């Protein structure tokens, strides 16, 4: 079985997990951007009361 035949028969088994991993990577990068914005946002700049949980989880 050549490499070309192997790729032709199993391309779904390669691309679907690769797409999932790439999507997870992009999601984490987007979360980092949103976290950086949240830390600069006037809405979340106030001090939390005692025993108050953060609203962004």
From Swiss-Prot:
Entry protein name: NADH dehydrogenase [ubiquinone] 1 beta subcomplex subunit 1
Coiled coil (residue ranges): none
InterPro entries referenced in this protein's UniProt entry, alphabetically: NDUB1
Residue intervals passing through the bilayer: 10-26
Family the entry assigns: Belongs to the complex I NDUFB1 subunit family.
Location of this chain's protein in the cell: Mitochondrion inner membrane
Protein role: Accessory subunit of the mitochondrial membrane respiratory chain NADH dehydrogenase (Complex I) that is believed not to be involved in catalysis. Complex I functions in the transfer of electrons from NADH to the respiratory chain. The immediate electron acceptor for the enzyme is believed to be ubiquinone.
Residues in the signal sequence: none
Top-level taxon: Eukaryota
Pfam families to which the protein is assigned, alphabetical: NADH_oxidored
One record GO biological process: proton motive force-driven mitochondrial ATP synthesis
Summary of subunit composition and partner proteins: Complex I is composed of 45 different subunits.
Upper lineage: Eukaryota, Metazoa, Chordata, Craniata, Vertebrata
Membrane topology of the entry: Single-pass membrane protein
Originating species: Mus musculus (Mouse)
UniProt keywords, alphabetically: Electron transport, Membrane, Mitochondrion, Mitochondrion inner membrane, Respiratory chain, Transmembrane, Transmembrane helix, Transport
Gene Ontology CC terms: mitochondrial inner membrane; nuclear speck; respiratory chain complex I
């Amino acid at each position: 079985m050549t490499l070309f035949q192997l790729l032709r028969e199993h391309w779904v088994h390669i691309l679907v997990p690769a797409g999932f991993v790439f999507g997870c990577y992009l999601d984490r990068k987007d979360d980092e951007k949103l976290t950086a914005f949240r830390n600069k946002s006037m809405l979340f700049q106030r001090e939390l009361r005692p025993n108050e949980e953060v609203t962004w989880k």
